[in-house]
Amino acid sequence: MRLGLRLFLGFFLIVGLAAFFVMRVFVNEVKPGVRQAMESTLVDAANVLAVMAAEDMKAGRITDGKFVRDLAEARQRELGATIWQFPKRRVDYRITITDLRGIVVFDSEGRDLGRDNSRWNDVYRTLRGEYGARSSPVVPGDKTNTVMHVAAPVRDGDRLIGVLSLAQPNASIDPFIAASQRSIMRQGAWLIG
């Protein structure tokens, strides 16, 4: 084989490998990027919901007040949304509210009333005036099926009266991550050749 042809093929091999590795970096960055965006949205929503829950929490009617009724109504809605070709039919947030000891006083799914959440990072840190969040497996030990929890303080003026944790399954964004990764791979394959 002639030297010129070898150099030509070597150059394209190096460029192709470089493009492949750059493409892999992009693909691997999609998942954490989407999860960071989801966390940011959960922070906003948790803080809005914490403000909305404060009046009922302060009045001692967090289990049967307006906040809970409004949440129940929202969970019953048929959303009928299509987001980037993926259907969104229902609200998939889970909301828990704990008292100052970290004991669950409200759970939108009704599963964990009375449970001590004071050692979970989202509640623990928020009770100490810090930002609290965690991602935990749905089934202990199963790291493939996790839920992101973001907490916000429930306040009466400046006084902390509880912690609202907003949880969303990471699986709810998996279709978007997979679609983005496929798109990057497809475009990268076209670019490489």
Located regions from the model:
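Extracytoplasmic/periplasmic sensor domains and loops in membrane signaling proteins
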Residues: 65-82, 92, 103-145
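Short beta->alpha transition motifs characteristic of CBS
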Residues: 107-111, 165-170
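Juxtamembrane membrane-water interface segments immediately C-terminal to a transmembrane helix
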Residues: 25-53, 177-183
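Extreme N-terminal signal-anchor transmembrane helix of membrane signaling/transducer proteins, especially
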Residues: 1-26, 189-193
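Helix-start (N-cap) segments at beta->loop->alpha junctions
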Residues: 140, 155-157, 166-185
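A short beta-strand signature within small-molecule sensing/ligand-binding domains used
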Residues: 143-153
